[in-house]
Amino acid sequence: MGAPPGYRPSAWVHLLHQLPRADFQLRPVPSGFAPRDQEYQQALLLVAALAGLGLGLSLIFIAVYLIRFCCCRPPEPHGAKSPPPGGGCVTWSCIAALLVGCAGIGIGFYGNSETSDGVSQLSSALLHANHTLSTIDDVVLETVERLGEAVKTELTTLEEVLSVRMELVAATRGARRQAEAAAQYLQGLAFWQGVSLSPVQVAEDVTFVEEYRWLAYVLLLLLVLLVCLFTLLGLAKQSKWLVVVMTAMSLLVLVLSWGSMGLEAATAVGLSDFCSNPDTYVLNLTQEETGLSSDILSYYFLCNQAVSNPFQQRLTLSQRALASIHSQLQGLEREAIPQFSAAQKPLLSLEETLNVTERSFHQLVALLHCRSLHKDYGSALRGLCEDALEGLLFLMLFSLLSAGALATTLCSLPRAWALFPPSDDYDDTDDDDPFNPQESKRFVQWQSSI
């Protein structure tokens, strides 16, 4: 099948499409896009479950590390004031992990924007395709109504005026038959009329889902950013309560990061399967939803020399009918106007109607060509399979970096918390120091007693 203009499956699509797939019984599953197939659904769920496995391993590792830290820590000498060896390394490793998490947040914002741009391009292509289809229906309807009105008024009036000349009446009736035939041929060109599938509704649904997806990721990114910043603040101020709160928040964000990674991985794999060969699935789905013939859908989705225009015969017959009407009207003008002055007005009106109809016909020929709708199809595929897929991969990288950074932070924070000086150390000051809080309090009491 011919690829749409400007679209070629990217290297990421080929790479993800080649990954093996298996169902819950670990049996191989074909990589063709089949979202309604139960085995294919299980394969995507299994891809998402790999993130759950990563979360479980992370939690087990963190738990084992903290248990070892709590149970196997050597006792500190009584009255020791100096920090244990390796304390600075622990703090700096925690800070480095948080900085990596902040870098991942920037990657996440970029990926979220790329995904949103791709979905917006898909919605714009759907809206433009709907405009083309609606214009075809409107032009056909206006042209058919214009020809019908001409048959009812001008041609009927012309027959009455020329009733005494049977050969002129016959020519007028011939023009009537050709006008009715042209209207019938043109009416069959409005192929989208009465179809239940609305590209506008699809675009609105896609935009609605994308708005909430974008907002959810922005909130997740901001949450990760706040956790990283407040954790760094807690380490800088050596605030135990802030570190404890951020430890709990880090655990929550760790779960969210792995969860988002599973969703992103399953979506990216499914999207790569679709983008590797989109024509077959889109053609079958559109035929199922619209009931249109495969000839029409193949013409617009493939748009190559191997597929002929299914409307070519109707267009040719319509053009011949209009040319025949034009020829008959010219003959009537030569024969009827010199003898019947009352025939001039309906003939001029018919000539004007025919000129407008021919202009509409040429516009209809351009609209029915596969080039415009096929261009929209290619634009939709580029938005979905290039920008959106690239954004998903950047979001996966963000989730991986944030999960790794938060796992390292959860291992480091308890050790860093243990290195903080106790609150009693702040009261170990000289009694004669004027900046001593106790001395300042006594000074205020003495001043108030004077």
Curated annotation (Swiss-Prot):
The keyword Acyltransferase is assigned to this record: no
A Gene Ontology cellular-component term: axon
Subcellular locations according to the entry: Cell membrane
Stated family: Belongs to the tweety family.
Taxonomy of the source species: Eukaryota, Metazoa, Chordata, Craniata, Vertebrata
Self-association and partners: Homotetramer; disulfide-linked. Homodimer.
Region (Disordered): 428-450
Membrane-spanning segments: 44-64, 89-109, 215-235, 241-261, 391-411
Gene source species: Mus musculus
Domain of life per record: Eukaryota
Stated name of the protein: Protein tweety homolog 1
Residue numbers on the Cytoplasmic membrane side: 65-88, 236-240, 412-450
